[in-house]
Amino acid sequence: MGVHDEARELTDEGRQYLAEAADAFSNWLLREGLPAVGCLRFSPLTRTRQTADILSRHLAPTDMEVAAGLRPGSSSREAGDLVSLALEQQAPSHLVLVSHHPLVANVIALWSDSEDLAPLLPGGCATLEVISPVRGGAKLLRHQPDPRKVLV
């Protein structure tokens, strides 16, 4: 019998791709003159906790926290409320969210008002400049649907 989704861990291959993608992302932030990651919010499930641990080693956020609003079944509105609250409380210049499908795809499509983006594979990521977490309230800066194809 398979491992329940909440307890499923990242594979060794997934950990490797994630570490490479995090390094590439960190380098991209520097090249683009974008702010360093200030806050990291992640779903309480095992693999997102593991992802957050790997990201924290590479991105060095000053604030990390589990966010129930990022667990499977959460709505885009819950994610938006989470972003609004984090921005009010911490005023981070850069917030990273680690969550699951379909929430990730829904939030990216909604906030960027773009329904035609390639879907993210596990470990894929997108970077948005969020003015407001509502439809069309963000500009897509970077889209990396496949973590095995590291963007430079």
Q: Where would I find each of the regions flagged by the language model?
A:
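Active-site catalytic microenvironments for nucleophilic, acid-base chemistry
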Residues: 24, 54-58, 85, 110-114, ...
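Generic beta-sheet signal
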Residues: 38, 91-99, 103
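Domain-level recognition of soluble alpha/beta enzyme cores
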Residues: 112-151
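Short phosphate-binding loop-to-helix
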Residues: 71-87
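Active-site-proximal alpha-helix that buttresses catalytic centers in soluble enzyme cores
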Residues: 1-68, 74, 117-118, 123
